[in-house]
Amino acid sequence: MNLLLGHNQFIGISHISEKRSREREKKFSDVKNIYKIVEKAADLGFEGMIIETHPRMLRFLDYYKKNQTFDIEFYLQVPYVQGYIQKMNEKGLYGLISEIIFRAGLKTASALAIKNLINLICKDYLSMVKSALYLEVKPFKDIKIKTILLHNVITDLALSLQMKEIFIEYIQYVETKMKLKPGFITLNFDLFKNCFKKWNIESPTIMTPINLKGYDMNP
């Protein structure tokens, strides 16, 4: 069994206590503190870590690449849903896409190119998924990505709408174009399992909550 280190605490998330959330936010605003925890976890036998394209995690990875006193594999969760929603509210779709492109290192993208991309997104949501996925993963090309995990917001929405093609396209794109292992995060494991069996899709890597209290589990 592989031990994986979660990342929520490093971006100030606690599902139990707002006070704890504030404490974590303050402590881990300095990425050196994240590095120390991950370094200790690797020393204790943790072989992998969940990350996402949160700005703080990107800063941590920059620090990791410069120092790298330990070796660990990363499981990349995409997309950064909270950040997408915030950018959409602040700057609209144009601002959101501009931010993704800039973060991917394509700083010279023209307004016309962005407008064309928006038009494409409106016409073809599968192209949107692939384009966003490519741009989300691009900043991580220099580190060991074990698996690309599709965020549960996207996974569970696609499951509820029975959008089989989303899963097939995602798996094929990650495997053939990105040469990485695809995976999914879901809070609806039973529905996920039944849908993949019905669609005859081979079970990939799955991350889902399993606990005695049924927290974040459906049903």
Question: Where are the language model's segments positioned?
Answer:
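Hydrophobic faces of well-ordered beta-strands that scaffold small-molecule active sites
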Residues: M1-H7, M49-I51, I72-Q77, I148-L150, ...
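N-terminal binding-site loop/beta-alpha segment at the start of enzyme catalytic domains
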Residues: M1-T69
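Active-site mouth loops of central-metabolism enzymes
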Residues: I16-N33, A113-A132, S160
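Short, acidic/polar
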Residues: E25-A42, M128-F140, F189-N194
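Acidic (Asp/Glu)-rich catalytic clusters
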Residues: D43, L61-D71, V137-K144, F196-N200
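Acidic-and-aromatic substrate-binding clefts and catalytic sites of carbohydrate-active enzymes
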Residues: G48-F60, V81-Y84, D156-A158, D190-F192, ...
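Hydrophobic alpha-helical segments and helix pairs
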Residues: Y94-D156
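Beta/alpha (TIM)-barrel catalytic core signal, keyed to glycine-rich beta->alpha loops juxtaposed to Asp/Glu
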Residues: D142, K146, V153-P219
